[in-house]
């Protein structure tokens, strides 16, 4: 599952795949809900750990919210990512339901247990009123997040000036702000083994939603996507004289989103996906694959990858073999995404070919990374028996040149959440991917136990 047009689903909009009882809560149909509760526990949780109360808050259904409270639903259950209904009220900027939940909570432990996470979301929303509300309720101004960031540090990092000014004026401790630098190979991070590690915390992996990362072959350029409240941008950091530059945004637009960066084999093009109109002026359209070309120290205007790649449906994620064959995902002529490849000949891409049943199923397959030598590929899929909402799977080429049946990469990589956006470094040593809205990495020795 991706961002852009799918972002609203990830943030609680109703999906056709949502189970009936959760869809009913989101629609606010109390009569229908009661009929379903005859055979379902009121504290049921969906695949992401969300309760009916999460859905009522996320879909802003006050009457449904009150009905669930009256029927005795638990009010402080966290989902798989630790988000409670109280957090959802902050996320969706619903002050009325937030106040109601605060009144219902049995004690004030939430101020220390969840205060950092609530401040974080309020600041990412650039919602000064919620920052003020949390302060009025007694949440400490210098409470920290799981990454050790104070509200003031977060506000300064994302340049939420009105919030940082207000926090400073009300006594936030400036001495707690950390200045994070990155030096040397892999941004100075200690390489992981068989346990995935958060990559470059508080420099790359911050309180924002980062995903879709790629290094160049030399390892001195790093590109990645960031979700800014539903609008996606691509950021860039460069190693110079041993120090990595502060990440800067190189592709953004007030109307369109850009994400899933990937370099062409010669590294003169940066490919990505976008909902940009073909003329660069109209309303956002379906998601296509685009690229920009290097021009000195900058980049050209976005160029559409053309009709042999793109369709009237949506195309996602890009990776390349050494010969320039592009692997990507598309949902053209179908109701779910599958993985395709397109050979590059004579300066253009050939008609795309869908991979066979060893890779594609009736489920969702996307976010494909192909080894440059085409010996294995890794992709995201949503399949029965998976560990979470979306898992990474791997397939290897056999001696006859066929893809082996893909297998789940297991709990060294996958979690109860959503794993996506795989990339393997040019030295073949590390797998990068997105998990829990951050970028993680792990040693590729994890592949060995997965080979057929």
How would you describe each model-predicted region?
Residues 1-21:
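Bacterial Sec-dependent N-terminal signal peptides
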Residues 19-21, 45-52, 78-84, 111-120, ...:
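Ankyrin-repeat boundary/"N-cap" motif
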Residues 19-38, 47-50, 58, 66, ...:
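Intrinsically disordered, low-complexity regulatory segments in ankyrin-centric signaling systems
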Residues 20-23, 104, 157, 161-179:
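Ankyrin-repeat-protein effector appendages
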Residues 23-28, 55-61, 88-94, 121-127, ...:
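Ankyrin repeat A-helix N-terminal signature
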Residues 29-37, 61-69, 94-103, 127-135, ...:
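Ankyrin repeat structural motif
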Residues 177-452:
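Short, conserved micro-motifs composed of acidic
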């Amino acid at each position: 599952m991706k961002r852009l047009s799918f972002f609203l689903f990830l943030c609680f909009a109703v999906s056709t795949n949502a189970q009936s009882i959760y869809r009913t809560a989101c629609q606010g149909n109390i009569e229908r809900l009661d009929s379903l509760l005859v055979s379902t526990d009121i504290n049921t949780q969906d695949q992401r750990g969300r309760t009916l109360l999460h859905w009522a808050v996320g879909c802003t259904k006050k009457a449904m919210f009150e009905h669930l409270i009256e029927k005795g639903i638990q009010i402080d259950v966290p989902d798989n990512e630790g988000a409670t209904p109280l957090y959802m009220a902050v996320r969706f900027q619903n002050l009325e339901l937030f106040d109601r939940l605060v009144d219902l909570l049995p004690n004030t432990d939430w101020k220390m247990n969840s205060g950092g996470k609530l401040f974080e979301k309020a600041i990412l929303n650039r919602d000064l009123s919620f920052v003020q509300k949390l302060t009025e309720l007694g949440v400490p101004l210098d409470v920290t997040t799981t990454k050790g960031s104070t509200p003031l540090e977060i506000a300064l990092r994302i340049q939420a000036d009105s919030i940082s000014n207000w926090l400073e004026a009300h006594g936030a401790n400036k001495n707690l702000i950390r200045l994070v630098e990155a030096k040397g190979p892999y941004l100075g991070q200690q390489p992981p083994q068989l346990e995935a590690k958060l990559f470059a915390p508080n420099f790359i992996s911050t309180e924002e939603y980062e995903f879709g990362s790629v290094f160049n072959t030399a390892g001195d350029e790093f590109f990645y996507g960031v979700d800014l409240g539903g609008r996606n941008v691509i950021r860039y950091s460069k190693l110079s004289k041993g120090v990595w530059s502060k990440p800067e945004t190189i592709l953004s637009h007030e109307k369109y989103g850009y994400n899933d960066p990937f370099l062409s084999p010669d590294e003169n093009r940066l490919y990505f996906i976008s909902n940009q109109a073909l003329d660069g002026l109209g309303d956002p359209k379906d998601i296509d694959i685009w690229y920009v070309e290097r021009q000195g120290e900058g980049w050209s205007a976005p160029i559409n990858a053309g009709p042999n790649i793109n369709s009237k449906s949506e195309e996602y994620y890009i990776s390349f073999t050494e010969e320039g064959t592009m692997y990507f995902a598309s949902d053209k002529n179908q109701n779910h995404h599958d993985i395709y490849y397109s050979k590059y000949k004579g300066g253009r891409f050939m008609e795309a070919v869908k991979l066979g049943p060893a890779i594609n199923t009736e489920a969702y397959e996307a976010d494909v990374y192909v080894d440059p030598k085409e010996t294995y590929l890794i992709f995201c899929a949503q399949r029965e028996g998976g560990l979470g909402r979306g898992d990474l799977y791997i397939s290897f080429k056999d001696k006859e040149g066929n893809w082996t049946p893909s297998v789940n990469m297991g709990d060294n990589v996958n979690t109860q959440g959503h794993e996506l956006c795989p990339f393997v470094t040019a030295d073949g040593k590390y797998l990068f991917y997105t998990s829990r809205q951050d970028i993680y990495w792990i040693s590729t020795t994890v592949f060995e136990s997965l080979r057929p």
